[in-house]
Regions:
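Short catalytic/signature loops enriched in Gly
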Residues: 39-55, 68-74, 79, 290-376
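Helix-to-loop junction immediately C-terminal to a conserved catalytic motif
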Residues: 114
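Conserved ABC transporter NBD signature motif
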Residues: 122-130, 142
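Conserved ABC ATPase "signature" region
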Residues: 130, 180-198, 307
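Conserved ABC ATPase signature
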Residues: 203-207, 211
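A short, proline-enriched helix->beta-strand linker immediately N-terminal to the Walker B motif
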Residues: 222-226
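P-loop NTP-binding/switch modules centered on Walker-like glycine-rich loops
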Residues: 229, 233-237, 241-319
Length: 376
């Protein structure tokens, strides 16, 4: 029996018309202007809302942009959007883990929250007060409540000061205890961080990386903070030492009811220590939620790709690796529409032109993805 091609009597003009309907034309300039107007309207509306009474830290539409080039008249010509419209809340005693590839804006966001960088726009509520517009003098009074542990323990300690001098300085500056009690107070903090008393007179170069990071943690604790930003605190350490530092951070959190903003690219570490997880890509939060919800039900394609890269210790359980094609676009020139569409395996035509809305798909589970929106 001969194979015959199916014939159709539908005019070509009608086929072309149907194709035009299925693939709508986008005016990128008009669409971009429309998106900006909608975003500004939402930001203006959210600014009128009261802060979350249960949150220690609440971030709304936070932006940090760096001007790369200016015209002769001083007008910005090129801008790097390191942090672009990020929102989340953290309750007292919780740990929020922030994950993403290098260059996604994790560290910049953490430093902007502490106002080590001045925010370009947005609100930062700490204990119910918006500190985004605080002056350096006003922030000085808050430094005892907000501290940071830096990534590199080798460069974050002054080499000419002893451990005792390093830890005693913030205690004296902020008048934490009377001068006569400073040394005893510092020794107590050192003991809590697993540091021997005789380390008090030693210098940073005499210690290993793990011991130096313990000193950095002790320095943050000397002023009795409520929020500690941990900026990849174990990435420069050996794996065996990493476990010790993570366990130390958890022990101290339980003893002092600390709140952590834990920045890392190691998903196994984040899963162990975090209560909530935020996933960032090119300066934006693409997914946010409770730890168990994010790991059990990752919705954003980028989150799925990150999780598929984690080695599985069970050799009998095969995990399909999701390989992202292409390089990460430049934050100074991000793609139009969804920033992830150039690498996304589920990208659609709409993703190239319209940025997805960051919306809630379950209790506390926020995602910014057109594919998730169509499936819901």
């Amino acid at each position: 029996m001969e194979n015959k091609e199916l014939e159709t009597n539908i005019p070509e003009s009608e086929i072309a018309a149907d194709a035009a309907v299925e693939t709508p034309a986008f005016d990128d300039a008009a669409q971009k202007e429309k998106e900006e107007q909608a975003r500004e309207a939402k930001i203006a509306a959210d600014k009128l809302l009261p802060p979350d009474p249960d949150a220690l830290l609440e971030v709304r539409h936070l932006k940090k942009h760096f001007i790369l080039k200016k015209t002769l008249m001083g007008k910005p010509l090129s801008t790097l959007k390191a942090v672009d419209d990020v929102s989340f809340t953290v309750k007292p005693g919780e740990t929020l883990g922030i994950v993403g590839e290098s260059g996604c804006g994790k560290t910049t966001m953490g430093r902007t929250i502490l106002k080590l960088h001045q925010p370009t726009d947005g609100q930062i509520f700490f204990e119910g007060k918006d500190i985004a517009g605080y002056s350096p003098k006003e922030m000085r009074a808050l430094r005892t409540k907000m501290q940071i542990v830096f990534q590199d323990p080798y460069s974050s300690l002054p080499p000419r000061s002893t451990v005792g001098g390093i830890l005693a300085e913030p205690v004296k500056v902020h008048n934490i205890v009377p001068k006569a009690e400073v040394k005893d107070y510092v020794l107590q903090i050192m003991e809590q961080c697993g540091l021997r008393d005789y380390y008090y007179e030693r210098y940073p170069h005499e210690f290993s990386g793990g011991q130096r990071q313990r000193i950095c943690i002790a320095r943050a604790l000397t002023v009795d903070p409520k929020l500690v930003v941990c900026d990849e605190p174990v990435s420069a350490l050996d794996v065996s030492i990493q476990a010790q530092i993570i366990n130390l951070l958890k022990k101290i959190q339980e003893e002092r009811n600390l709140t952590y903003l834990f920045i890392s690219h190691d998903l196994s570490v984040v899963k162990y220590i975090s209560d909530k997880i935020g996933v960032m890509y090119l300066g934006s939060m693409v997914e946010f939620g409770e730890k168990d919800e994010i790991f059990d039900n990752p919705m954003h394609p980028y989150t799925n790709a990150l999780f598929s890269a984690v080695p599985n210790p069970n050799p009998d359980e095969k995990v399909q690796r999701i390989i992202l094609k292409g390089d990460i676009p430049s934050p100074a020139n991000p793609p139009m529409g969804c920033k992830f569409h150039t690498r996304c395996p589920r990208a659609m035509e709409i993703c190239k032109h319209i940025a997805p809305e960051y919306k809630e798909y379950g209790k506390g589970h926020f995602v910014a993805c057109h594919a998730c929106e169509q499936e819901s």
